[in-house]
Amino acid sequence: MEQEKIRIKLKAFDHRVLDQSVKQIIETVKRTGGVVRGPIPLPTRKRKWCVLRSPHKFDQSREHFEIRAFSRIIDITRFTPQTIEALMEINLPAGVDVEVKMRG
């Protein structure tokens, strides 16, 4: 029988805010007696756009934009009810998307 585990996936456009959130989650889990695996960095997703600067002609003048989405995975293998309670009460910075899944 597999042991239950919690997988937390974090996404953000700013890697500094993302790493700060990951650090906060790991400290909370360790403080409440849980065992953490990670953070596992996933590949950065880059999206690029090319836009004409002029509304009518002059195709040679273009502007390029890029946005990068950073993501990390944290696995919590052993946890207590206090760990889950502490995770629910964490205040993460704005701009960090969190997905939580229970497995096992």
Swiss-Prot record:
Keywords: Ribonucleoprotein, Ribosomal protein. GO terms for cellular component: ribonucleoprotein complex; ribosome. This is Small ribosomal subunit protein uS10. Part of the 30S ribosomal subunit. Involved in the binding of tRNA to the ribosomes. GO terms for molecular function: structural constituent of ribosome; tRNA binding. Pfam families: Ribosomal_S10. It comes from Aquifex pyrophilus. Belongs to the universal ribosomal protein uS10 family. One of its GO terms (biological process) is translation. It comes from the Bacteria. InterPro entries: Ribosomal_uS10, Ribosomal_uS10_CS, Ribosomal_uS10_dom, Ribosomal_uS10_dom_sf.
